[in-house]
Amino acid sequence: MFKMIYNIARTELQMLFYSPVAWLILVVFGIQAGLIFAGKIEGLVVSQEMGYSVAGATFNIFANPWGAVFVNMQNYLYFYIPLLTMSLVSKELSSGSIRLLYSSPITNLQIIVGKFVSMMIYGLFMIGILLLITLCSWSVIKDFDWPMVFVGLLGLYLLICAYAAIGIFMSSLTSYQIVAAIGTFAVLMVLSMIGNWWQEYDFIRDVTYWLAMPGRSGKFIAGLICSEDLLYFILVVCLFLALTIIRLNAVRQKIRFVITLGRNVGVILLVCVLGFITSMPKMKVYYDATATKMNTLTPNSQEIVAKLDGGMTITTYINALDPGASWYAAFYFLKPDMERFEQYLRFKPDMKLKYVYYYDTCANPQLDRRFPDKNLREKMIEVCKMYGLDSNRFMGPEEIRKKIDLSGEGNTFVRQIVRDKLGYEFITICNVSRVNERFLPPSNGW
């Protein structure tokens, strides 16, 4: 079996490099990465000449969210992969050579895995180009952070493999290579953007955020390995390879559509269940590869979190009429806000996050001038129209006051931390819009 997979992978690689497309992609990929790298180096040199500090040069060149090499190349990868995968299966379908494969003692599993292995090897060539750039950086940067860079390269390689698996699946759906390329590009573009879609709906938000790929590799680029992200790429690769095999089996054995559909749904549901399990905080394992452990709480903070035994709930209250940080954790930004607590969830996985949306009196002169004749509810509805939010999800003043009195905080953006250990409560309310923190003692003292 493995020998057959090896033979198929070798044949695919030979055919790939006989084509100018594979060489052209490597050349363009290298030039693009080199130009980005040169721009980052130039910026650091200019900063140094002007007397500014250039601390954290490795991070700034490769992992800084604002235009670093790995970050930019991550965003460009889905332009390259469809051109490589568009012919992997579709050429067999269009030329009729798939019938020759079917007549030989070879399974669809061997065919698909062999083609995927060829793409994995090609992906190593792309990573090799980036490795050459890192070697250039290593020669001029003192205390070069190799572990962080290697983890970033791993994240990009996993992203290439995931894109390749999707491309192989799309290639199996049609005998037209251009259609396969466009279809792959469309799917990859959707998966790159889907993390920002339908964020106002709780269940859909979790699904779309889980499907988004760039955020997964972004953590690797930052030097953090999380078991959830690692298993995510493995699950995505297995999912699309399995769907491809099911598709070819249906064509080869002329299986009924209902049976094929059932198998596809079964595989998708299995991956969803496994994805849900791996995303549970208690199931996550982390490794921070950065030299300064920038993705991890400081030892003192870890010690404080370790002392917080028992359950803990952080409730965030967002007032629709708050002019300051009212949308700091709005529906659209709920997941990014939750990620702010990920370092704490890493060391206290039983911590719970809740969000409460309401409207109440709040100092907002601009809103008062704009809607002088409207009451609180009418103002809230106008604000929801501006932001495209569902006004029915906001509690009224009477309803929120039954839960908690936030008038002491001016009904602005606040977080409430409640511990439920040993029968006592510890409450902290942080006012983000005024950039301060307060400690409100519970009724039985602290």
Give the residues covered by each predicted segment.
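Aromatic- and glycine-rich beta-strand/loop motifs that create alpha-glucan
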Residues: 1-26
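Hydrophobic alpha-helical transmembrane segments of multi-pass membrane transport/permease proteins
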Residues: 20-46, 72-81, 186-190, 271
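Secretory targeting signals
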Residues: 35-38, 56-74, 113-175
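Terminal transmembrane helical anchor/hairpin motif
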Residues: 40-63, 181-253
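Long, hydrophobic alpha-helical segments
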Residues: 65-91
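Transmembrane helix boundary and interhelical loop/hinge segments in multi-pass membrane proteins
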Residues: 83-102, 116
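Internal/C-terminal transmembrane anchor helices
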Residues: 256-282
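Juxtamembrane extramembrane loops of integral membrane proteins
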Residues: 282-446
